[in-house]
Amino acid sequence: IFREKSDKRRGITRLRLVHSESIILSDILPVLDNLGLVVIDQYPTTIHVSGRPEAVISTYRIRGTKQMQVDLMNRRNRLSSAIRASILGVFDNDSFNRLLLRADVPWNYVSLIQALHSYGRQLGSPYGRETVREALESNSDVVRSLTEYFRIKFDPSIEGLDTSNVCDKRLQ
């Protein structure tokens, strides 16, 4: 994920994917759309090196939707990890994925939120997926605080932190 000089004033960021075969647009566009991104165009380049398998580099010019103006360069590590996980099939591709950029949380926490919503539906929650997603997106600061609280509370590598003050500043 990078930006060229001419891209900054237009709010455009470039995403480059390197793979052994061409990614079909119908496969990648829903992934990017569910992350809240708009794809402006795509430039594929095929690389031929003798004695090696062919590689394809696809460069996409992207930006956030009008409703979600975020600096993609500041979130490029999170974004690239989520795209990779989605392409590999370990990150569900649905509209909850917008929380990754909106709330600035990692993809595995978005997966946790997806699972908690599904569990709630099994228990009889009357709220549909889009209703819950819209509520969470509208309160992205709360989502970020709750996922931060969850990490501090349950991550075994974090010891001795007091969770009582984690959300206080953001929730006031």
Where are these regions (language model features)?
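Non-catalytic interaction/regulatory segments
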Residues: 1-37, 41-172
